[in-house]
UniProtKB/Swiss-Prot annotation:
The gene is mnmA. The keyword Cytoplasm applies. Catalyzes the 2-thiolation of uridine at the wobble position (U34) of tRNA, leading to the formation of s(2)U34. One of its GO terms (molecular function) is ATP binding. It comes from the Bacteria. The active site is at residues 119, 215. This is tRNA-specific 2-thiouridylase MnmA.
Length: 370
């Protein structure tokens, strides 16, 4: 059966039995299959699972999470049944600082965060790659649905074959230096293939559901953020674009740009959240046309391929976005760029990522400022 599931060699100049591969295991089906597949192909697999949160008992009970409690046990159980070593590293303090606190502070700036990108950018890639080097391993392998294509020494990050599972949006902050050591063996398969492989390898987690939403949010977003930043639930005013008071809100944590439901305002036309003014603790609302825009400013740029001035690309403005045609332009501000969409787009949210593609290839991107 394994002949149906061929993958690119992890390294061109070494045989599998000569290659030590660190596999980041979350306890889910994807990373477990990646580890089992490589082990069966003869690679020296070492499984590593990060304990990221949940030792206080608050976060690890939610179904569909990862990297805590049951998931760590599942990863260890897979390693034992397949027959490769497995280690658990406690990264709770780093995760709290780099991801959870950033999540809360981003909300407090009136933005909508994507903690999964920050986690990949810092804990999972930056820190795990250092672990990979410290252990004298050749590569770091993950179960992400994304493809790494290498030709003539040039490495490209591309969308997964399975577009419904593609995770390239969440990996835009990966650097060329990191890609030298990273490998994504599942990018050329469909999720249904991975389920088949899980059963073929007799993995106990073959029917385990996919992880959903943000792993450390055990309750609602608002309740989680309220615990991290109590000031986010202070009452304030809801005003229109001219400053007229229309009502009162119970905390900015309950709102995000583009939101319509839950405003609690009776008005002669539908109103949407236009902006969250954290300085005045105000939620600014207005008609839908105010939320339609073409020009986007992005910061903290990461280019896997440096775009030329006015380069035509397709951009994704949220993970579920199919993509919009746009051009990329330089600005006078350091480490910022301007993206001009061909057509108006509704509800562009500061704090989200703007990821640029050239066909299937990820060019790079940045965080939306405005």
């Amino acid at each position: 059966m394994l002949k149906e599931f061929e993958i690119e060699p992890l390294l061109k100049d070494k045989a599998p039995h000569q290659i030590k591969a660190i596999v980041a295991m979350s306890g889910g089906v994807d990373s477990s299959v990646a580890a089992a597949l490589l082990h069966n192909l003869g690679y020296q697999v070492i499984g590593v699972t990060l304990q990221l949160y949940g030792t206080d008992g608050n976060a690890n009970a939610r179904k569909g999470a990862c990297c805590a409690g049951q998931d760590i046990y599942d990863a260890k159980r897979v390693a034992e049944s397949v027959g490769f070593p497995h280690y658990i590293l406690n990264y709770e303090e780093i995760f709290k600082k780099e991801v959870i606190e950033d999540f809360a502070s981003t909300y407090m700036r009136g933005e909508t965060p994507i903690p999964c990108v920050r986690c990949n950018q810092t804990v999972k890639f930056r820190d795990l790659l250092q672990v990979t080097k410290n252990l004298g391993a050749d590569v770091l392998v993950t179960g992400h649905y994304v493809r790494r294509l290498e030709k003539n020494g040039e490495v490209k990050l591309c969308r997964s074959i399975d577009k419904s599972k593609d995770q390239s949006y969440f990996l835009f902050a990966t650097t060329q230096e990191q890609l030298k050591l990273l490998r994504f063996p599942l990018g050329g398969f469909y999720k249904s293939d991975i389920r088949k492989l899980a059963k073929y390898f007799s993995l106990q987690i073959s029917e385990k559901p996919d992880s959903q939403d943000i792993c450390f949010v055990s309750e609602s977003y608002s309740k989680t953020i309220a615990k991290l930043a109590p000031q986010s639930v202070q009452k304030g005013k809801i005003v229109d674009v001219n400053g007229k008071v229309l009502g009162e809100h119970s905390g900015i944590v309950n709102f995000t740009v583009g939101q319509r439901k839950g405003l609690g305002i009776a008005h002669n036309e539908p109103l949407y959240v236009i902006k969250i003014n954290t300085e005045n603790n105000e939620v600014i609302v207005g008609p839908i046309n105010v939320l339609m825009q073409k020009k986007i400013l992005i910061k903290e740029l990461n280019w896997l391929e440096q775009p030329k001035e006015g380069m035509e690309v397709t951009v994704k403005l949220r993970s579920s976005h199919a993509g919009s045609l746009a051009t990329i332009h330089s600005t006078d501000e350091k480490n910022k760029a301007c993206v001009i969409l061909n057509d108006d787009y509704f509800g562009i949210s500061p704090g989200q990522a703007c990821v640029a593609y050239k066909g299937e290839q990820v060019i790079g991107g940045g965080w939306i400022c405005s």
